[in-house]
Curated annotation (Swiss-Prot):
Organism: Polynucleobacter asymbioticus (strain DSM 18221 / CIP 109841 / QLW-P1DMWA-1)
Function description: Binds to the 23S rRNA.
Record key words, sorted: Ribonucleoprotein, Ribosomal protein, RNA-binding, rRNA-binding
Descriptive protein name: Large ribosomal subunit protein uL15
Region named Disordered: 1-51
InterPro entries found in the cross-reference section: Ribosomal_uL15, Ribosomal_uL15/eL18, Ribosomal_uL15/eL18_sf, Ribosomal_uL15_bac-type
Amino acid sequence: MQLNTLKPAEGSKKNRRRVGRGIGSGLGKTAGRGHKGQKSRSGGFHKVGFEGGQMPMYRRLPKRGFVSMTRRHVGQITLNDLAKINLPEVDLLVLKAHGFAGEQINAVKVIKTGELKIAVTLKGLTATAGAKAAIEAAGGKLVELA
């Protein structure tokens, strides 16, 4: 097999249907749109949610709730992930730089999955009770930012 002899699989490449190009094509005259009516006209289709003049569902139901613009997006990080970073001090910016927290994340909680053998100082992060005990047992500490 050579690159210049490669061909697409049989039947995998179909030609685009050219409608409205004579009766011999099988898709001439009405071009698959049937006879008359709104759907046969160019630009003749209703907007999304239109129910033929009946009061549409999205207007029959009441408005409800809102999306808070100041919502906290909390991420999670495990003790195994902290061990992979292998730095003495870790904060949110370090986690973002190493790809452990996404762009939208504005708070991170450490959970106890795996084990930590190095002393790590966590700045501005929260932790579960088990994770906090494991971090302190390894010689690390949690520092709250004011």
